[in-house]
Amino acid sequence: MADLMFIPLLERALQARASLFDARHETAFRLFNGFTEGEPNLVVDLYASTLLLHNYADDPTDGRLIAEGAAHFLQGQLPWLHAGIIKIRSSKSQAERNGYLLFGEKPDTKVREHDVWYSIDLTMNRDASFYLDTRDLRQWLIENSRDKTALNMFAYTGSLGVASLAGGAKRVIQHDLNRQFLNVAKTSYSLNGFPIRKEDFVAADFFTLAAKLIFE
């Protein structure tokens, strides 16, 4: 097993984020940011009961040992974890960059944040389909979107638009070039009981769409 000098860093991270855990294990947040917490080869995220480990090492083999050591430690600290995924950022393999199962059988497919459900697909691409660092922005949208109309450009999987609808927006148009990403947004709508209007999901090139909107 890898040098475990980073274990105290994980212990401090768990203590610092104790208030973010929820009793039902449905939420999502960054559990350990190695870039600022002492181990730049490792980032650990939590999505409901699924642990997501990012191997940022220049040498993937070195980073894998650290990630596996972290996974072993965190499984002991968080016994309710039922799956773990590792993403290897510098791998030549697309499958390894997207992530593969390290332990468990089935990763979570949804998380709840500020009482809103969001669909996730943790191995769909190199990212994890849900940006944790826009948590506060989603809360702001929930609090400030009532009766507004929103255009969510480069929507990715649409979490900002979902938050706007949860906040009472009259209409949200979700745009992204990738239709697969928008399908994740549609699943989020279904999870929250929001109506899915085909015309509100636009898979198109940004410049083509922008020109069309300007001249309408």
Language model regions located:
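Non-catalytic substrate-recognition/targeting regions of SAM-dependent transferases
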Residues: G38, L42-D45, I66-L132, Q139, ...
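S-adenosyl-L-methionine
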Residues: N178-E216
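Non-catalytic accessory regions of SAM-dependent methyltransferases
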Residues: M1-T50, Y56
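Conserved SAM-binding motif I beta-strand of class I
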Residues: R171-D176
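Conserved class I S-adenosyl-L-methionine
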Residues: D147-Y156
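Cysteine-centered catalytic environments shared across enzyme families
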Residues: I7-E26, R64-I86
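Conserved SAM-binding loop of SAM-dependent methyltransferases across substrates and taxa
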Residues: T157-K170
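Phosphate-coordination loops involved in phosphoryl transfer and adenosine-cofactor binding
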Residues: R146-D147, A169
